Amino acid sequence: MKDPIGRPVRIVSICFREGTKSLSEIATIVDREAARGCDLVILPETWLGTTPEPLDGPAVTTLRALAHQHHTYIVSPIYRLDGKRRLNSAILLERDGQIACIYDKGYPYWSEFDLSTTTSIGNDAPVYAADFGRVGMAICFDVNFPEVWERLAEQEAELVVWPSAYSAGSSLQAHAINHHYYIVTATGTKHCLAYDITGEKLLNERSSDLHISRLTLDLDRGIYHQNFNMEKRDRLLRERSKEVFQEKWLDDEQWFVLKAKRHGFSARALAKSYGMEELRDYLRRSRREIDRMRGGPFPRKTAARG
């Protein structure tokens, strides 16, 4: 990409029903799409079917070779065989084909415990520092459990990839609104959704058979609250008008979004140099300081009845 503005990441989401495409078919599609140029390819949840494979099995081995050949990241979610354990895993492959990060589904769906080998439960949601930004993963039923998404935000995720059997819709939008990271899906419903750091829907595409979506996101866009930022913002936009601009103003939420205008400049770095605090940091600091004044965190669980 020649002289990019901001921090763009080119994403390909490939959506199809679990077990309906062979490894050879998917390898051909990934090869073709990656050859067109992209930074990240995403496949849907357990795309191979219910038979688990080890990390040195044919699926991961084939996709590792394609990641290396095309110098692209790939997320391959499969049932992973780890010794005698089955895990529902999203495997992030680096541009050189190495395994960068593995997320094991923290909240498997109930039917996953009824398979011939029951599905083991993941314990954490890691975030990986890719060359384009910080990437986290969650899978399908995880969408219903806020702690997974909070954990990703705690680790400064900028993009969350969500492979799934279904679409989820506004449930995902809520997480984008609350945590201000991008969310991109690859689903078995042949439906791709993408949500902005503002929570706005960026993409909503589907097909009757296999569906492929392509989109580019700028991970350098920054979102801010009006509180304590307006004078600093005004000075930034006045003094650095050639490098950064206000892309969005969300009046009801009292938020605004800054974006770079020129190659070689970061909107978020410039805003920070002017003393501006990003929205996620502002809310985190507010929670920490108000909890300290209270004498402890606000209660999150209600005592069991009975």
Per-segment meaning from a language model:
Residues M1-R32:
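N-terminal, active-site-proximal structural segment of metallo-dependent hydrolase catalytic domains
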Residues G19, R36-D39, V143-P146, R305-G306:
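Eukaryotic scaffold repeat domains enriched in small/polar residues
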Residues T20-I102, S167, N178:
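Cys-nucleophile CN-hydrolase/nitrilase-fold catalytic domain and related Cys-dependent amidase chemistry
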Residues L55-V75, V143-V244:
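CN hydrolase (nitrilase-like) catalytic-core segments centered on the catalytic cysteine
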Residues D82-Q155, S170, A174, N178:
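Active-site catalytic loop in hydrolytic enzyme cores
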